[in-house]
Amino acid sequence: THDQTRRQRQMCIRDRNPHILNLSPPLDMSAKWFAGHTAYTMAKYTMSMCVLGMAEEFKDRGVAVNALWPRTAIATAAVQNHLGGDEIMRLSRTPEIMADAAYEILTKDSKEFTGNFCIDDVVLHDAGVKDFTKYASVPFGELMPDFFVPDDTPLPQEIKDS
């Protein structure tokens, strides 16, 4: 995978607005994220540390490197099969929220927006989205928080209300 990553980075450098987007969490060193699953947390945070390193490494070439992470569980097969079946799926948002947030990040100026750890709904709120009910598996239902979201992550009222 190292060779493949290197080739992809080289292709990015030639693009007019090059981006690398990792799906990795913000680096929050709270002990609660390590308790009971240290190896898993280390693996996730390793991807996040790559964002920091590559953002600095490629900044002078105009290649943006950012991370995107969901605030809540996302209704995927992994969530369905490993985290609690239909009950957790009802407490999740649809994958479209991550796709829409990724689009917003990938269309930003790569020379201006790099080295950021983004939360899906914050990205969309900043882009003007005010109604998040379309992303909920059950509109106005309770949502299950995802792992690794720092306690101090902003939560605008429009996001709370939908």
Language-model regions, residue ranges each:
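Short-chain dehydrogenase/reductase
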Residues: 6-7, 51-52, 99-102
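Single conserved hydrophobic/aromatic residue that forms the stacking wall/gate
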Residues: 1-15
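Rossmann-like NAD(H)/NADP(H) cofactor-binding core
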Residues: 19-21, 61-68, 116
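Active-site-adjacent segment of SDR/Rossmann-fold oxidoreductases
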Residues: 14, 53-63, 109
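Active-site helix of classical SDR
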Residues: 40-43
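C-terminal helical subdomain
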Residues: 67-68, 85-162
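Short beta-loop-alpha junction of Rossmann-like oxidoreductase domains
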Residues: 31-33, 63, 69-83
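Residue(s) in the substrate-gating loop at a strand-loop-helix junction
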Residues: 25-26
